[in-house]
Amino acid sequence: MAKESIQAIKEALLTVTDATDERLASWREDERSGVQQAIKQWERRQLAKEKEWQLFKEMSQFEEAAYKKGHRLIAGIDEVGRGPLAGPVVTAAVILPKDCQLLGLNDSKKLSAKKRETLYNQIQEQAVAIGLGIADQGVIDQINIYQATKQAMKMAIDDLAFTPDYLLIDAMQLDVPQPQESLIKGDARSISIAAASIIAKVTRDRLMEEYDELYPGYGFKNNAGYGTKEHLLGLEKYGVTPIHRRTFAPIKDMI
């Protein structure tokens, strides 16, 4: 009887989810290096999935605690863009379903752009509700970045299709009627806040890509408005744009 081709085994391994699968024992006895390499790749994938599951469970603890208290619509809230010299601060509020199984959720800054996009789409498909809040540079200059962030977070809550009955917020306290919990580094500790972080990050990055076309020469699509060398050189060469924050150094010294 002819042996299975290496390609056939590779494809079959993509369907194997259990280490007790009898086929694994058979393939492990196959002396072909291509088969052994494929098994090692499968083992690495399994280990990565196990780590993702463990992280997911750890990051679900705050949601589980809120469910046990009787809450049902738990919103995670986060912001992106407090530090840049240009562009808005973007906030998101996300209510995930109780049986959510979005593996890979983490602080958006720890994820690759490709992974963020994948998770962004999955969150859009699975979330109970998503709300966005945006405070532009005019608001930031008028009331300061801290207050602008709070204002944008409230906007994100109001933008939700359903009113949440509990809030998990990344390092912020809000003057709202719902009970809330402020978590330092919450985007790496709560699946709901992590989801909000990803929605806010992808939304803001897309906005900055549009601004890059509108105001070329500052590298907005690469630096998202942060004060990189390319951005600072652009300021020296082309001056201040309408999306720059005039109360932030060095812009305030240039006008």
Curated annotation (Swiss-Prot):
It comes from the Bacteria. It holds the Pfam family RNase_HII. It catalyses: Endonucleolytic cleavage to 5'-phosphomonoester. One of its GO terms (molecular function) is RNA-DNA hybrid ribonuclease activity. Its main location: cytoplasm. SUPFAM superfamilies: Ribonuclease H-like (SSF53098). It is found in: Cytoplasm. Its cofactor is Mn(2+); Mg(2+). It is an enzyme of class 3 (hydrolase). Keywords: Cytoplasm, Endonuclease, Hydrolase, Manganese, Metal-binding, Nuclease. One of its GO terms (cellular component) is cytoplasm. PROSITE patterns: RNASE_H_2. GO terms for biological process: DNA replication, removal of RNA primer; mismatch repair. Belongs to the RNase HII family. Endonuclease that specifically degrades the RNA of RNA-DNA hybrids. This is Ribonuclease HII. It comes from Enterococcus faecalis (strain ATCC 700802 / V583). The lineage of its organism: Bacteria, Bacillati, Bacillota, Bacilli, Lactobacillales.
